């Protein structure tokens, strides 16, 4: 089965959501209705899956809006994925700016993340 660690934040799994075996989830984490974490997925925390998303590989600090997919291996961090977006197999993103400066996230995106976390 999956491994769930809520020491760093709550984990909410909605009715009809599925976490496949071998997955590791660290809170805070929200998974809305009908979403699926594929086999062996690693969620490092601060992640929200909107309704009917499919997620695999590694994710950290990501908001997936409804029906968005990242169903295969690869790393995705510090991102907002819009509704109906699909990331192909082995998609990777960097969460480090190429000049090593701090990344700045707009207030709008932070508000959106809090909305999905139901704050």
Where are these regions (language model features)?
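Structural signal for interior beta-strand "rungs" in well-ordered beta-sheet cores
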Residues: 1-119
């Amino acid at each position: 089965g999956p491994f769930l660690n809520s020491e760093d934040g709550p984990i909410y799994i909605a009715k009809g959501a599925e976490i496949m075996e071998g997955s590791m989830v660290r809170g805070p984490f929200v998974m809305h209705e009908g979403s699926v974490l594929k086999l062996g997925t690693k969620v490092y925390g601060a992640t929200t899956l909107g309704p009917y998303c499919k997620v695999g590989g590694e994710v950290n600090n990501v908001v997936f809006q409804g029906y968005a997919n990242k169903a295969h291996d690869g790393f995705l961090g510090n991102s907002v994925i819009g509704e109906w977006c699909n990331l192909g197999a082995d998609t990777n993103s960097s969460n480090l700016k190429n000049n090593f400066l701090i990344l700045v996230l707009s207030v709008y995106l932070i508000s959106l993340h809090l909305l999905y976390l139901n704050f």
